[in-house]
Amino acid sequence: GASNVAANLSNLISEVKLYGELALDVSSDEVLELTKEHGIQCRISHSLNVTPVKTRFVGNEGQHILRLDVEIPNSKNRQIETPTEKILKDISVGDIVIVSDYNKGSIEKDTVQKISDITDLIFVDPKQEPEIYNSAFLVKPNMKEYLKWNGEFTTDSAIQFMNKHNWTWLVLTDGANGMH
């Protein structure tokens, strides 16, 4: 998820920092090693008891057949500094912040607002209600998520929805139909 985004970014720009939550276990060691190979600075909070593991089963032709996710919901130890607290200490005016929200509790209702008090360049891959992302520069839901939020898709309704949430850009991914 977020590690893949960070790895791809590290091929484009020189300084990438990754914030998130992992446990102190073998799976988190693998994530940290991969990010190190890509020159990514890790600012990971070790606040989970078990690191979520995603296993993809791939066919002979490279097609994904199945993905198995293993995680323990609500396995957090909130005595440790959160990713949001770390981000707020690190970012400056003009920094670009990419928020990959998996709705696991790392992105709180005021996270984007707090970040936007420092920098305007916030790009969001959302999973929660749209109000959480007010003031983001770009929000990129898939069409299913957007229709759940807004009920319909027309260019005019999308512009109104974008303005309502103070987003500069709204990009909808729509499978085989591309992006809107």
Positions of predicted regions on the chain:
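Conserved phosphate-binding/catalytic loop of the ribokinase/pfkB sugar-kinase fold
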Residues: 43-49, 56-91
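Conserved thiamine diphosphate
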Residues: 10-18, 60-65, 141
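Substrate-binding N-lobe of the ribokinase-like
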Residues: 1-52
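Residue-level signal for inorganic ion chemistry
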Residues: 9, 97, 138, 142
